Amino acid sequence: MKSIFLVFFAVCLVKAEAGKGRKREPNIINPPCRECYVQDSSGNCVYDKWGCGGARKREPNIINPPCRECYVQDSSGNCVYDKWGCGGARKREPNIINPPCRECYVQDSSGNCVYDKWGCGGARKREPNIINPPCRECYVQDSSGNCVYDKWGCGGARK
């Protein structure tokens, strides 16, 4: 009886060890990819089989687009913000936030959002991966890198 118990225990231990997989930390907001996807060097969301269980799981049907909520995949495969899919005309335009930067970012003289290490704990914390764009909700980054208010993405009414 003891030998059967020991064999059973050993088999359970081996299965438990085999079940442990290499877990990667989830993506920070950049890239805006869904779970199990990572952003490649060209900015596209690609399936990461190792981050999703490796050889233990079958690769699921590809989610097209593999972008987070409020993002859609453009023709080149990049995830871009979809202002209509995220509120459209359903919300009133809120008061303008100045500066329109996320927490730990400040607006510099040219209007760009830059990381403020002192406002976020100074030398006690490492500078996080840059959030691209580092703009608050209802703001988008224009071609020059400035955060500008996006009334359509925040529910502005059609005129």
UniProtKB/Swiss-Prot annotation:
It comes from the Eukaryota. Disulfide bonds join 33-45, 36-52, 67-79, 70-86, 101-113, 104-120, 135-147, 138-154. Coiled coil: none annotated. Keywords: Cleavage on pair of basic residues, Disulfide bond, Nematocyst, Secreted, Signal. Residues 1-18 form the signal peptide. One of its GO terms (cellular component) is nematocyst. Residues 19-26, 59-60, 93-94, 127-128 form a propeptide. Its main location: secreted. It is found in: Secreted; Nematocyst. Belongs to the sea anemone BBH family. Inhibits ion channels. This is U-actitoxin-Avd13b. It comes from Anemonia viridis.
